[in-house]
Swiss-Prot record:
<dbReference type="GO" id="GO:0005762">
    <property type="term" value="C:mitochondrial large ribosomal subunit"/>
</dbReference>
<dbReference type="GO" id="GO:0003735">
    <property type="term" value="F:structural constituent of ribosome"/>
</dbReference>
<comment type="similarity">
    <text>Belongs to the bacterial ribosomal protein bL34 family.</text>
</comment>
<comment type="subunit">
    <text>Component of the mitochondrial large ribosomal subunit (mt-LSU). Mature yeast 74S mitochondrial ribosomes consist of a small (37S) and a large (54S) subunit. The 37S small subunit contains a 15S ribosomal RNA (15S mt-rRNA) and at least 32 different proteins. The 54S large subunit contains a 21S rRNA (21S mt-rRNA) and at least 45 different proteins.</text>
</comment>
<keyword id="KW-0687">Ribonucleoprotein</keyword>
<keyword id="KW-0689">Ribosomal protein</keyword>
<comment type="function">
    <text>Component of the mitochondrial ribosome (mitoribosome), a dedicated translation machinery responsible for the synthesis of mitochondrial genome-encoded proteins, including at least some of the essential transmembrane subunits of the mitochondrial respiratory chain. The mitoribosomes are attached to the mitochondrial inner membrane and translation products are cotranslationally integrated into the membrane.</text>
</comment>
<feature type="compositionally biased region" description="Basic residues">
    <location>
        <begin position="73"/>
        <end position="82"/>
    </location>
</feature>
<dbReference type="InterPro" id="IPR000271">
    <property type="entry name" value="Ribosomal_bL34"/>
</dbReference>
<keyword id="KW-0809">Transit peptide</keyword>
<feature type="region of interest" description="Disordered">
    <location>
        <begin position="68"/>
        <end position="108"/>
    </location>
</feature>
<feature type="transit peptide" description="Mitochondrion">
    <location>
        <begin position="1"/>
        <end position="20"/>
    </location>
</feature>
<protein>
    <recommendedName>
        <fullName>Large ribosomal subunit protein bL34m</fullName>
    </recommendedName>
</protein>
<dbReference type="GO" id="GO:0005739">
    <property type="term" value="C:mitochondrion"/>
</dbReference>
<feature type="compositionally biased region" description="Basic residues">
    <location>
        <begin position="93"/>
        <end position="102"/>
    </location>
</feature>
<dbReference type="Pfam" id="PF00468">
    <property type="entry name" value="Ribosomal_L34"/>
</dbReference>
<keyword id="KW-0496">Mitochondrion</keyword>
Length: 108
């Protein structure tokens, strides 16, 4: 029934009110969709073009995520190390605050 609803959305606005596709077929044939029995929906389904519902939801991703952090001990100690903390006013403040808080490690 979900397929029927999606198919109904593709129809002309005047035809959307019809409850059954066989009514729309009007005597057994719908343009481009041959059926022997207007009430045999199995043959109507087989003659309809297949639509991949999940194909529209798939996305192609060219960007990779999660590989931004490439650890380097040299950069880490240069940025957050004890000597760099002592050199700047804000760094000395960080060391002071960590000392007051009782941290075991003041910096890297």
């Amino acid at each position: 029934m979900m397929f029927m609803q999606q198919f109904r959305n593709l129809l002309h606005p005047a035809m959307k009110g019809a409850r059954n596709i066989s009514i729309l077929a009007g005597g057994g044939t719908m343009r481009g969709f041959p059926t022997r029995n207007p009430f045999n929906t199995a043959t109507l389904y087989s003659s309809l073009p297949t639509m991949n519902i999940f194909g529209q939801m798939q996305q192609v991703r060219w960007k990779t995520y999660g590989n931004e952090y490439q650890p380097s001990n040299r950069k880490r100690k240069r940025k957050h190390g004890f000597l760099s903390r002592i050199r700047s006013v804000n760094g000395r403040r960080v060391l002071r605050d960590r000392r007051q808080k009782g941290r075991m490690y003041l910096s890297h």
